[in-house]
Regions:
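Nudix hydrolase/Nudix homology domain
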Residues: 5-8, 30, 70, 81, ...
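Short aromatic/basic micro-patch
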Residues: 73, 123, 146
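Acidic, metal-coordinating catalytic segment for phosphate/diphosphate chemistry
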Residues: 7-46
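Acidic/glycine-rich phosphate/pyrophosphate-binding loops and surrounding catalytic core
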Residues: 50, 100-113
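Active-site-adjacent beta-strand/loop module that shapes the phosphate/pyrophosphate-binding cleft
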Residues: 20-28, 113-132
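Conserved Nudix-box catalytic region and its N-terminal flanking loop in Nudix hydrolases
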Residues: 2, 37, 46, 53-91, ...
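Acidic pyrophosphate-coordinating catalytic loop
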Residues: 10-14, 65, 110-121
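Short loop segments at secondary-structure junctions
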Residues: 27-28, 49-52, 63, 127-131, ...
């Protein structure tokens, strides 16, 4: 017999998450409590464009307060609770990179932290980019960093790229392109 959720208590909420305290019924009859974060989901984008040295990806350098450091990562963003996945991808691409894409290819979904959150991330390869900026979030300090895909694949394998969603997005993109 597996654990099952006996009750869920909504503890706190925001526009983009809900914090719950769940009571779990264990197989032996005991109960335990665990925190859980409900999340509407997010998109992860691999904006790819041609360059003289092969395909390059529009990466971001962004400060992440939880880590208290600036990291290199793919553009990504939280969707609204009822927002369409592709509409979210189109919006986030314009907000974070200042570009729109004529072609989006789904690269699958991932659960980035299933031990604490139900957040689901949808990965997209975004191609045929043209400038089309939208204002971004006021609290985001983002630097756009175009980088060769080959270099990013190496960084994903050697540990210099540490953001999990970015590692997965880069490796899935490289695999997708190799299958063409």
């Amino acid at each position: 017999m597996a654990q099952k959720i006996a009750s869920k208590l909504l503890w706190q909420q925001d526009d983009s998450w809900r914090l719950r305290l769940d009571t779990l019924q264990l197989p032996d009859g005991r109960t335990t409590q665990k925190g859980a974060i409900e999340h509407p989901g997010a998109v992860v984008l691999v904006p790819l464009r041609p360059s003289a040295n092969g395909p390059e990806v529009l990466m971001l350098r962004q400060y992440r307060h939880v880590l208290d450091q600036t990291i290199l990562e793919l553009p990504a963003g939280t969707r609204g609770w009822e927002e369409d996945w592709l509409a979210c991808a189109q919006r986030e691409l314009r907000e974070e990179t200042g570009h729109r894409a004529e072609k989006f290819t789904e690269l699958g979904q991932i659960w980035p932290a299933p031990g604490i959150s139900d957040e689901l991330m949808q990965l997209y390869l975004a191609e045929a980019l043209t400038p089309a900026p939208l204002p971004g979030d006021e609290d985001e300090m983002i630097e756009l960093v175009p980088m060769p895909l080959d270099e990013l694949v190496t960084m994903a394998w050697n540990g210099r790229l540490q953001d999990a969603k970015s590692i997965i997005g880069i490796l899935r993109t490289a695999h997708h392109l190799a299958q063409k």
